[in-house]
């Protein structure tokens, strides 16, 4: 497990913990590693789980799919990101999401239930870890709130501008990369890809954006871009 420490140190779940404490926790929560190829599923909707995943290599998509294959992307998790925490913390809860690999990946599986009972070794860092878990769950709520804000807009144009604006503000820059390719962006915003591509072309012609693949540059009035750098 020591080889994963550089990634684990950056994870909010292990914030404020020493390397020895992290290794002790991994033992406490029965950490196990698995690796799979792109497009393989880690969790499927309809299942239940007692473990949450931590990406240590590659990236995964948290999605919802219907019987006809229509995909709604809820989030994209890279190295250091968690997924499945709410379900792992709720024994017997049935997943209404699936987690699928966007590229070849390796993850750590952690048994959250071991954190919610008294630690048999009475770890001094146990309470700190629980506080960190609460912080991780709170951050997931904020991520979902962002998505609700974007998809709640009435038009494809408004959804795009809402999303691009939020990324720009979060990164404090008018020039930025997004984590999605075009199909994934359409799935995340719950819009048709062709309609989205048409709207992106219109926004470029109007001079509001410049884009190349997943890179975007926004153009705003001088009196509204204070605090955001090009």
Residue ranges of predicted features:
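Phosphate-/nucleic-acid-contacting segments
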Residues: 156-230
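A small-molecule sensor/coupling module
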Residues: 22, 95, 113-155
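Short phosphate-coordinating micro-motif centered on Lys-Gly-acidic
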Residues: 41-47
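Short, small/polar residue-rich loop motifs at catalytic or cofactor-binding pockets
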Residues: 28-29, 47-49
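Cyclic nucleotide-binding regulatory module and flanking cytosolic helices
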Residues: 1-41, 87-90
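Cyclic-nucleotide recognition modules
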Residues: 73-131
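Glycine- and acidic-residue-biased ligand/ion/polar-headgroup-sensing regions
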Residues: 39, 50-63, 79-80
């Amino acid at each position: 497990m020591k080889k994963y420490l550089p990634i684990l140190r950056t994870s909010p779940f292990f914030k404020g913990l020493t390397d020895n404490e992290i290794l002790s926790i991994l033992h406490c929560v029965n950490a196990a590693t698995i690796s799979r190829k792109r497009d393989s599923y880690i969790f499927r909707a309809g299942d239940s789980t007692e473990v949450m995943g931590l990406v240590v290599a590659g990236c995964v998509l948290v999605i919802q799919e219907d019987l006809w294959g229509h995909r709604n992307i809820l989030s994209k998790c890279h190295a250091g990101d968690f997924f499945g925490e709410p379900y792992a913390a709720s024994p017997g809860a049935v997943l209404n999401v699936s987690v699928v690999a966007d590229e070849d990946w390796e993850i750590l599986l952690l048994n959250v239930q071991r954190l919610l009972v008294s630690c048999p070794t009475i770890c001094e860092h146990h309470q700190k870890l629980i506080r960190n878990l609460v912080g991780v769950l709170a951050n997931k709520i904020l991520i979902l709130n962002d998505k609700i804000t974007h998809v709640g807009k009435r038009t494809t144009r408004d959804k795009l501008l809402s999303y691009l604006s939020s990324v720009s503000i979060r990164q404090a820059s008018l020039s930025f990369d997004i984590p999605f390719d075009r199909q994934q962006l359409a799935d995340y915003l719950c819009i048709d890809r062709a309609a989205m591509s048409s709207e992106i072309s219109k926004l470029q012609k109007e001079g509001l954006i410049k884009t190349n693949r997943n890179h975007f540059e926004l153009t705003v009035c001088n009196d509204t871009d204070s605090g955001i750098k090009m």
